[in-house]
Amino acid sequence: MRIDIVSLFPEFFDAFFSHSIIKRAIEAERLSMGVTNPRDFSHNKHGQVDDTPYGGGAGMLMMAPPIFEAVESVIAQYDSETNSAYSIDEMCDEMSLIGNPSESIRRRVIFMGPTGQPFTQEKARELATYDQLVLICGHYE
């Protein structure tokens, strides 16, 4: 299983990956993790990824283009890695991998929010059936 996290604070996850159950799962190659900063996909020199709400109002919103591009990037990277794991002969025998490798990949993109569903053991079991999870973490005050 591959879990990719899109976050404005990628350094927050360093300690999380290097301890306890997550660390052991990574070492046993049962899990791979990655963190992508949407600032890397910003369209200006300041790395800006937030903007004022359309129509005015208080607060700030995350801009869509850097988030979309970050998600597209981690999906493309995973598809490339999994596709490169097959030789040409194996790909010819496995018709579902020809053309669009993502057809055979079970993936879920989840935008984390303050009003979302609680994370339960049942939800963990459901998500564990996917090949790739992409978690988009917002920044809330």
Which role fits each region the language model picked out?
Residues 63-87, 91-93, 97-135, 139:
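S-adenosyl-L-methionine/SAH cofactor-binding core of RNA-modifying enzymes
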Residues 10, 139-141:
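Short, acidic/turn-prone active-site loops that include or flank metal/cofactor-
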Residues 50-54, 133, 140:
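Short, flexible coil/turn micro-motifs enriched in small/turn-prone residues
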Residues 1-75:
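N-terminal nucleotide/polyanion-binding subdomain common to many enzyme families
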